[in-house]
């Protein structure tokens, strides 16, 4: 194994990728620092669950179509497949012999831990294992949940987003803007929620569109960023995710 394994940086809640928000750089001068290590900046759903973000991250690293998992997609009520990164992977030969360093900020922390869990269970049938990740580094990582989620409308007892909450209103405002701009905003800031069907249908009025979005299961279940960041969500994830002796954790 090379001692110059690639580094992949994963943004947090409401974060953005290198092709969004013009000159703004989520990682500051990180890519200007001289280093022999190849570095890549991922772009995953800023409002998506740790699981969905991990699936999007895996596809970007490997260069494959996003696969959220057949059982997961059926249970949560969204499409199984997402964007196709075939031929565009950061590390096409990603494997145990060519592992990566993962760096996650905020929600990026549970995202990269979830990714290693899925790799350890060969979730995508690539013949993967936990050793595809040589190190996991978290920066202000939300590893045990955050009480801030309850201020945004998560129920303190269940962790689920309340029907009338700031989070729900924010989502509707975002989607109304997306409708009004005809999707142009995706080139500026992409919420990556296409697998939930948040795409304007031909001939659909704004009222019909918002009604459909409001009825989506996205904020009614556990497959969203808000739940992933609650104490309940973190507790459930930490009960399943493991650490592995061949991986460095910081």
Predicted feature descriptions by range:
Residues 117, 126-250:
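Helical cap/lid subdomain of alpha/beta-hydrolase-fold lipid enzymes
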Residues 1-164:
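N-terminal non-catalytic accessory region
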């Amino acid at each position: 194994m090379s001692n110059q394994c690639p580094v992949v940086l994963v943004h947090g809640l409401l974060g953005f990728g290198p092709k969004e928000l013009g000159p703004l750089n989520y990682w500051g001068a990180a890519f200007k620092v001289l280093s022999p290590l190849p570095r890549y900046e991922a772009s995953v759903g800023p409002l998506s669950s740790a699981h969905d973000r991990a699936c999007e991250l895996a596809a970007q690293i490997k260069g494959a179509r996003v696969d959220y998992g057949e059982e997961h997609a059926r249970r949560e009520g969204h499409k199984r497949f997402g964007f196709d990164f075939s031929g565009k992977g950061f590390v096409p030969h990603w494997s145990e012999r060519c592992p990566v360093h993962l760096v996650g900020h905020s929600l990026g922390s549970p995202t990269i831990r979830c990714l290693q869990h899925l790799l350890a269970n060969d979730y995508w049938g690539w013949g993967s294992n936990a050793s595809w990740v040589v190190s996991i580094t978290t920066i202000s990582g939300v590893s045990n949940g955050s009480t801030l989620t309850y201020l945004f409308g998560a129920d303190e007892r269940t962790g689920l987003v309340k029907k009338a909450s700031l989070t729900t209103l924010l989502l509707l405002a975002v989607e109304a803007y997306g409708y009004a701009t005809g999707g142009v905003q995706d080139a500026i800031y992409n919420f990556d929620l296409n697998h939930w069907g948040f795409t304007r249908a031909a001939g659909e009025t704004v009222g019909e569109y918002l009604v459909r979005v409001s009825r989506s299961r996205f904020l009614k279940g556990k497959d969203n960023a808000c739940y992933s960041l609650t104490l309940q969500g973190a507790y459930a994830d930490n009960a399943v995710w493991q650490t592995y002796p061949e991986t460095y954790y910081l």
